[in-house]
Protein backbone atom coordinates (compact mmCIF):
# COMPACT_ATOMS: atom_id res chain seq x y z
CA UNK A 1 0.00 0.00 0.00
CA UNK A 2 2.77 2.43 0.90
CA UNK A 3 4.56 1.74 -2.40
CA UNK A 4 1.37 2.23 -4.41
CA UNK A 5 0.48 5.48 -2.70
CA UNK A 6 4.04 6.73 -3.18
CA UNK A 7 3.69 5.91 -6.88
CA UNK A 8 0.38 7.75 -7.00
CA UNK A 9 1.98 10.87 -5.56
CA UNK A 10 4.93 10.53 -7.95
CA UNK A 11 2.68 10.23 -11.00
CA UNK A 12 0.73 13.24 -9.82
CA UNK A 13 3.83 15.39 -9.48
CA UNK A 14 5.04 14.29 -12.92
CA UNK A 15 1.92 15.65 -14.65
CA UNK A 16 1.19 18.57 -12.31
CA UNK A 17 -1.95 17.09 -10.75
CA UNK A 18 -3.30 19.44 -8.05
CA UNK A 19 -4.53 16.61 -5.77
CA UNK A 20 -2.67 13.37 -6.56
CA UNK A 21 -4.09 11.46 -3.59
CA UNK A 22 -7.62 11.67 -4.99
CA UNK A 23 -7.19 12.53 -8.68
CA UNK A 24 -4.81 9.78 -9.87
CA UNK A 25 -6.59 6.52 -10.71
CA UNK A 26 -4.59 3.42 -11.66
CA UNK A 27 -6.01 1.23 -14.44
CA UNK A 28 -4.63 -1.61 -16.55
CA UNK A 29 -3.96 0.65 -19.56
CA UNK A 30 -4.99 3.92 -21.17
CA UNK A 31 -7.76 2.18 -23.09
CA UNK A 32 -9.40 1.26 -19.80
CA UNK A 33 -8.89 4.83 -18.57
CA UNK A 34 -10.74 6.26 -21.57
CA UNK A 35 -13.48 3.64 -21.30
CA UNK A 36 -13.86 4.58 -17.64
CA UNK A 37 -14.55 8.20 -18.56
CA UNK A 38 -16.91 7.30 -21.39
CA UNK A 39 -18.91 4.88 -19.24
CA UNK A 40 -18.88 6.65 -15.89
CA UNK A 41 -18.96 10.30 -16.92
CA UNK A 42 -20.62 9.85 -20.31
CA UNK A 43 -23.14 7.33 -19.05
CA UNK A 44 -24.29 9.77 -16.39
CA UNK A 45 -24.25 12.94 -18.49
CA UNK A 46 -25.09 12.13 -22.12
CA UNK A 47 -28.41 11.33 -23.75
CA UNK A 48 -30.68 12.11 -26.71
CA UNK A 49 -30.22 15.67 -27.94
CA UNK A 50 -26.66 15.91 -26.59
CA UNK A 51 -23.45 15.93 -28.64
CA UNK A 52 -19.75 15.25 -28.21
CA UNK A 53 -16.85 16.34 -30.40
CA UNK A 54 -13.95 14.09 -31.44
CA UNK A 55 -11.06 14.64 -33.85
CA UNK A 56 -10.01 12.67 -36.91
CA UNK A 57 -6.62 12.15 -35.24
CA UNK A 58 -8.00 10.03 -32.40
CA UNK A 59 -6.80 6.57 -31.46
CA UNK A 60 -9.52 3.92 -31.51
CA UNK A 61 -9.51 3.96 -27.70
CA UNK A 62 -10.93 7.49 -27.79
CA UNK A 63 -13.46 6.66 -30.51
CA UNK A 64 -14.92 3.19 -30.00
CA UNK A 65 -16.06 3.69 -26.36
CA UNK A 66 -18.04 6.73 -27.48
CA UNK A 67 -19.60 4.80 -30.37
CA UNK A 68 -20.60 2.05 -27.94
CA UNK A 69 -22.17 4.58 -25.59
CA UNK A 70 -23.86 6.39 -28.48
CA UNK A 71 -25.66 3.17 -29.41
CA UNK A 72 -27.17 3.10 -25.93
CA UNK A 73 -27.73 6.80 -25.25
CA UNK A 74 -28.52 8.28 -28.66
CA UNK A 75 -26.31 11.38 -28.60
CA UNK A 76 -24.58 12.94 -31.63
CA UNK A 77 -20.87 12.57 -32.43
CA UNK A 78 -19.21 15.40 -34.37
CA UNK A 79 -15.71 15.47 -35.85
CA UNK A 80 -12.90 18.01 -36.17
CA UNK A 81 -11.43 17.43 -39.66
CA UNK A 82 -7.78 17.56 -40.74
CA UNK A 83 -5.77 19.87 -42.95
CA UNK A 84 -3.62 18.57 -45.79
CA UNK A 85 -0.62 18.24 -43.45
CA UNK A 86 -2.58 16.28 -40.82
CA UNK A 87 -3.17 19.12 -38.39
CA UNK A 88 -6.55 19.82 -36.84
CA UNK A 89 -8.65 22.16 -38.96
CA UNK A 90 -10.18 24.52 -36.40
CA UNK A 91 -11.92 26.77 -38.94
CA UNK A 92 -15.40 25.67 -37.85
CA UNK A 93 -14.59 25.00 -34.19
CA UNK A 94 -17.15 27.46 -32.75
CA UNK A 95 -19.93 25.86 -34.79
CA UNK A 96 -18.80 22.34 -33.95
CA UNK A 97 -18.71 23.17 -30.23
CA UNK A 98 -22.22 24.58 -30.12
CA UNK A 99 -24.20 22.44 -27.68
CA UNK A 100 -21.36 19.95 -27.13
CA UNK A 101 -20.96 18.39 -23.67
CA UNK A 102 -17.56 16.71 -24.11
CA UNK A 103 -14.53 16.93 -26.37
CA UNK A 104 -12.28 13.90 -26.94
CA UNK A 105 -8.83 15.07 -27.97
CA UNK A 106 -5.39 13.57 -28.48
CA UNK A 107 -2.41 15.69 -27.48
CA UNK A 108 -0.15 13.92 -29.98
CA UNK A 109 -1.25 11.63 -32.80
CA UNK A 110 -0.04 8.06 -32.52
CA UNK A 111 0.04 7.86 -36.35
CA UNK A 112 1.58 11.13 -37.58
CA UNK A 113 3.02 12.57 -34.38
CA UNK A 114 1.01 15.75 -34.91
CA UNK A 115 0.96 17.94 -31.81
CA UNK A 116 -2.44 19.52 -31.22
CA UNK A 117 -3.23 22.93 -29.65
CA UNK A 118 -4.66 21.42 -26.48
CA UNK A 119 -4.87 24.59 -24.40
CA UNK A 120 -6.55 26.55 -27.22
CA UNK A 121 -9.15 23.86 -27.87
CA UNK A 122 -9.74 23.35 -24.16
CA UNK A 123 -10.37 27.05 -23.57
CA UNK A 124 -12.91 27.10 -26.41
CA UNK A 125 -14.54 23.91 -25.14
CA UNK A 126 -14.90 25.27 -21.62
CA UNK A 127 -16.37 28.49 -22.98
CA UNK A 128 -18.98 26.32 -24.72
CA UNK A 129 -19.67 24.39 -21.50
CA UNK A 130 -17.90 21.15 -22.45
CA UNK A 131 -15.43 18.98 -20.56
CA UNK A 132 -12.23 17.83 -22.29
CA UNK A 133 -11.03 14.22 -22.27
CA UNK A 134 -7.35 14.12 -23.28
CA UNK A 135 -5.57 11.12 -24.74
CA UNK A 136 -2.08 11.90 -23.47
CA UNK A 137 -0.50 8.52 -24.27
CA UNK A 138 2.05 9.89 -26.74
CA UNK A 139 2.44 13.27 -25.02
CA UNK A 140 3.31 12.44 -21.40
CA UNK A 141 6.32 10.22 -22.29
CA UNK A 142 7.84 12.81 -24.62
CA UNK A 143 7.08 16.32 -23.33
CA UNK A 144 6.92 18.00 -19.94
CA UNK A 145 3.26 17.82 -18.93
CA UNK A 146 1.21 20.05 -16.65
CA UNK A 147 -2.49 19.24 -16.68
CA UNK A 148 -3.27 22.56 -15.01
CA UNK A 149 -1.58 24.51 -17.80
CA UNK A 150 -3.29 22.39 -20.46
CA UNK A 151 -6.61 23.05 -18.71
CA UNK A 152 -8.16 19.67 -19.51
CA UNK A 153 -10.61 17.81 -17.26
CA UNK A 154 -9.40 14.23 -17.78
CA UNK A 155 -6.10 12.82 -19.08
CA UNK A 156 -5.22 9.20 -19.84
CA UNK A 157 -1.84 7.58 -20.46
CA UNK A 158 -0.08 4.24 -20.05
CA UNK A 159 3.15 2.95 -18.52
CA UNK A 160 4.57 0.92 -21.38
CA UNK A 161 4.99 3.97 -23.62
CA UNK A 162 7.18 5.72 -21.04
CA UNK A 163 9.76 3.00 -20.27
CA UNK A 164 7.49 1.34 -17.72
CA UNK A 165 5.87 -2.10 -17.68
CA UNK A 166 2.76 -3.20 -19.51
CA UNK A 167 -0.43 -3.66 -17.53
CA UNK A 168 -0.51 -0.22 -15.89
CA UNK A 169 -2.43 2.84 -17.04
CA UNK A 170 -3.35 6.14 -15.46
CA UNK A 171 -6.42 8.31 -15.45
CA UNK A 172 -6.15 11.80 -14.05
CA UNK A 173 -9.41 13.66 -13.53
CA UNK A 174 -10.57 16.75 -11.71
CA UNK A 175 -11.59 15.74 -8.22
CA UNK A 176 -15.07 17.25 -8.43
CA UNK A 177 -15.81 15.37 -11.66
CA UNK A 178 -14.47 12.03 -10.43
CA UNK A 179 -16.35 12.42 -7.16
CA UNK A 180 -19.66 12.88 -9.00
CA UNK A 181 -19.14 9.88 -11.29
CA UNK A 182 -20.51 6.40 -10.50
CA UNK A 183 -18.06 3.48 -10.19
CA UNK A 184 -16.91 1.90 -13.44
CA UNK A 185 -16.30 -1.65 -12.14
CA UNK A 186 -17.72 -3.41 -9.10
CA UNK A 187 -16.05 -5.73 -6.61
CA UNK A 188 -13.57 -5.76 -3.79
CA UNK A 189 -11.55 -2.67 -3.00
CA UNK A 190 -14.03 -0.16 -4.43
CA UNK A 191 -16.63 -0.43 -1.67
CA UNK A 192 -17.06 1.22 1.68
CA UNK A 193 -20.02 -0.87 2.77
CA UNK A 194 -22.15 -3.71 1.33
CA UNK A 195 -25.53 -4.80 2.65
CA UNK A 196 -28.35 -6.97 1.38
CA UNK A 197 -30.10 -3.94 -0.08
CA UNK A 198 -27.15 -2.27 -1.77
CA UNK A 199 -23.65 -0.87 -1.35
CA UNK A 200 -21.79 2.36 -0.75
CA UNK A 201 -18.71 3.00 -2.91
CA UNK A 202 -15.37 3.89 -1.40
CA UNK A 203 -13.91 7.37 -1.57
CA UNK A 204 -11.59 8.50 -4.36
CA UNK A 205 -9.56 7.03 -5.91
CA UNK A 206 -10.46 3.56 -4.57
CA UNK A 207 -13.96 3.93 -6.03
CA UNK A 208 -12.45 3.31 -9.48
CA UNK A 209 -9.87 0.66 -8.52
CA UNK A 210 -11.86 -2.54 -8.12
CA UNK A 211 -10.11 -5.84 -7.47
CA UNK A 212 -6.48 -6.69 -6.84
CA UNK A 213 -4.36 -3.79 -8.11
CA UNK A 214 -1.35 -4.10 -10.46
CA UNK A 215 1.14 -3.69 -7.63
CA UNK A 216 4.39 -4.62 -9.39
CA UNK A 217 3.38 -2.63 -12.48
CA UNK A 218 2.63 0.46 -10.40
CA UNK A 219 6.02 0.26 -8.70
CA UNK A 220 7.61 -0.16 -12.13
CA UNK A 221 5.85 2.95 -13.41
CA UNK A 222 7.22 4.86 -10.41
CA UNK A 223 10.75 3.76 -11.34
CA UNK A 224 10.24 4.75 -14.99
CA UNK A 225 9.11 8.23 -13.99
CA UNK A 226 12.12 8.62 -11.71
CA UNK A 227 14.35 7.76 -14.68
CA UNK A 228 12.60 10.18 -17.04
CA UNK A 229 12.82 12.92 -14.44
CA UNK A 230 16.53 12.19 -14.10
CA UNK A 231 16.95 12.69 -17.84
CA UNK A 232 14.74 15.79 -17.78
CA UNK A 233 11.69 16.01 -20.02
CA UNK A 234 12.91 19.18 -21.72
CA UNK A 235 16.13 17.35 -22.63
CA UNK A 236 14.10 14.39 -23.90
CA UNK A 237 12.07 16.70 -26.10
CA UNK A 238 15.14 18.48 -27.52
CA UNK A 239 16.79 15.15 -28.35
CA UNK A 240 13.67 13.81 -30.05
CA UNK A 241 13.28 16.96 -32.17
CA UNK A 242 16.91 16.59 -33.27
CA UNK A 243 16.39 12.92 -34.15
CA UNK A 244 13.16 13.70 -36.00
CA UNK A 245 14.80 16.48 -37.99
CA UNK A 246 17.70 14.18 -38.91
CA UNK A 247 15.37 11.34 -39.94
CA UNK A 248 13.12 13.56 -42.06
CA UNK A 249 16.07 15.30 -43.73
CA UNK A 250 18.01 12.11 -44.44
CA UNK A 251 15.02 10.16 -45.75
CA UNK A 252 14.04 13.06 -48.02
CA UNK A 253 17.58 13.38 -49.39
CA UNK A 254 17.85 9.66 -50.10
CA UNK A 255 14.37 8.92 -51.42
CA UNK A 256 13.18 12.27 -52.74
CA UNK A 257 9.80 12.09 -54.54
CA UNK A 258 9.47 8.38 -53.74
CA UNK A 259 8.78 9.32 -50.12
CA UNK A 260 5.73 10.96 -48.59
CA UNK A 261 6.01 12.02 -44.94
CA UNK A 262 2.58 12.58 -43.47
CA UNK A 263 2.06 15.22 -40.81
CA UNK A 264 3.66 18.60 -40.10
CA UNK A 265 6.75 19.37 -42.16
CA UNK A 266 8.64 21.01 -39.29
CA UNK A 267 9.99 18.68 -36.57
CA UNK A 268 8.91 21.03 -33.77
CA UNK A 269 5.27 20.54 -34.79
CA UNK A 270 5.32 16.82 -34.24
CA UNK A 271 6.53 14.12 -31.90
CA UNK A 272 9.01 11.40 -32.74
CA UNK A 273 6.40 9.13 -34.36
Each language-model region and where it sits:
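Pyridoxal 5′-phosphate
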Residues: 1-273
Amino acid sequence: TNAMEAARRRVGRFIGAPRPATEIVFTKNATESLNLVARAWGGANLGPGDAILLTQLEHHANIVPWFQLQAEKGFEIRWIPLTADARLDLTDLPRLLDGVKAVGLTAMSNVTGTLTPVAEITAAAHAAGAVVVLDACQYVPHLATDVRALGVDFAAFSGHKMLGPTGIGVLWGREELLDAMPPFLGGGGMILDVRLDGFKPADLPAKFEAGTPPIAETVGLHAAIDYLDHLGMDAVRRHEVELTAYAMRTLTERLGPQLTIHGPAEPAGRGGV
